[in-house]
């Protein structure tokens, strides 16, 4: 099963000739202030984590360095995420500043969390990211990489 997303709507509007490209669709219609913008309804952090873990997944805080938070607030977010059952932190992704990557790795160590990395790929039409193009995690955190998590290892062993 698949879900209809804003990207599908953008593609439809481009294909229909309403806009010349996706960027214009998002700016004019889908982003905040746009004619067709619908605010997201978010569940609580603990509800999301429960759903992820209930489905057999690993709850990972995605690209936390991109949130508009100072370091004290970011640390509080990571602490709260961990307290409500989050297990991992994405510490590397495209265009991350080296200092932020190092800080996220430090937070992962401090809070005894697994660390992940990802190219933040959303769909093939996205031009702002390339699959797999991101800085590697530091060798100092090799024992904490998410693929060392028991859930991950069990899935790999089952293949």
List the predicted regions and their residue ranges.
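Short acidic/polar alpha-helix capping motifs at helix-coil junctions
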Residues: 10-16, 40-44, 66-72
